[in-house]
Regions:
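Amphipathic alpha-helical polymerization modules
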Residues: 1-140, 224-307
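Surface-exposed beta-strand edges and their flanking turn/coil or helix-capping segments
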Residues: 18, 51, 148-150, 206-210, ...
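Aromatic-anchored, glycine/proline-accented short structural segments
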Residues: 180-243
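Amphipathic alpha-helical coiled-coil/heptad-repeat segments
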Residues: 91-207
Length: 307
């Protein structure tokens, strides 16, 4: 078949366009630093990369959850540190009030100080992290502590001395294998419990002597005794306050275990994320040196076509 000028011209333009298209594609890959742009370019590798991307997305969710958990723990630590300081200062105030040299004015001053501590503790127990009340247990949408018309302290609507309280849980998924049973209950060891019960924090019920186990109420009862100058059984109340101060101190120290737990899983996720990102780069990334050489060769071929 005889080659006409038109056929030769069409062939030349076709080759020229093909060279330009290949050169542009390579340039695009270099700019994007990717080895392919479409799923159809490399289906097998693209599917592997999609799995890695899904894993990275999952890790990011866990990291955000751990960050929120750490924020809650930090706020909890700050708040309970304040309550711990108050309980220690309250002990010192009570000791001052029960010494033999204390007159009625000293006792009234101590009582006023203890009343102030009550208000501070109540405000602290209603501390929020973001939109959530951190001591609300499993009910974080409203302030957990309040006073009824008679001045009785309530926790989630129940009198702290006469109410019935249960263990409270609010779990977050941190990537250890969330497991939910048929009833919708989360397996305790499969997630992190960020719930902190205000009932546990301040105490509930009364002891065998009829003395309240609640720190807030205890301070009020002791203040009332100083106000009335009735110290006949003050030692029982002082001992109870010392017991509550010790309990608060133990809770404060135990925070470290939760922080260590979060740090451990944060480090594990960081390692997983690093490995996944490396794998993603291997699957999707481009060898720039090799790609630039290919681009240079394509550019030479294209320029040759223009001669």
């Amino acid at each position: 078949m005889r080659m006409t000028n038109r056929m030769m011209s069409n062939s030349y333009l076709k080759n020229l366009n093909n060279s330009l298209e290949k050169m542009n594609e390579t340039n695009y890959l270099i700019t994007a630093e990717r080895s392919y742009m479409k799923l159809s370019d490399d289906p097998a590798t693209a599917l592997k990369a999609m799995k890695v991307r899904k894993s990275l997305s999952r890790i990011e969710i866990y990291e955000n959850n751990l960050s929120d958990a750490q924020g809650i723990i930090d706020q909890y630590e700050s708040t309970i540190s304040s309550i711990n300081s108050i309980s220690k200062e309250a002990l010192a105030q009570v000791l001052q009030g029960i010494t033999g040299t204390s007159d009625i004015n000293v006792k009234k001053t101590v009582a006023k100080t203890l009343r102030g501590f009550q208000e501070t503790i109540l405000a602290a127990a209603n501390t929020k992290y973001g939109d959530d009340y951190i001591f609300g247990g499993d009910q974080v949408g409203k302030a957990p502590f309040s006073l009824d018309g008679s001045g009785n302290l309530l926790y989630n609507g129940q009198n702290v001395e006469t109410g019935t309280f249960h263990d409270e849980f609010r779990y977050i998924d941190v990537g250890i294998g969330l497991d939910v049973d048929a009833s919708g209950n989360v397996a305790p060891k499969s997630a992190f419990n960020v719930s902190t019960s205000g009932a546990v924090l301040l105490g509930t019920g009364v002891d065998g002597n009829g003395i309240t186990n609640n720190l807030h109420n205890l301070l009020g009862d002791i203040a009332e005794k100083f106000e009335n100058d009735d110290l006949s059984d003050i030692q029982l109340y002082s001992d109870k306050l010392n017991e509550k101060a010790s309990d608060i101190r133990i809770q404060y120290v135990s925070i470290g275990a939760k922080s260590d737990y979060i740090s451990f899983f944060s480090e594990r996720l960081y390692s997983e994320k690093t490995n996944a990102a490396k794998r993603q780069s291997e699957l999707e990334g481009i060898n720039l040196e090799e790609a630039i050489i290919i681009f240079s060769e394509q550019e030479l071929a294209y320029n040759a076509c223009l001669q």
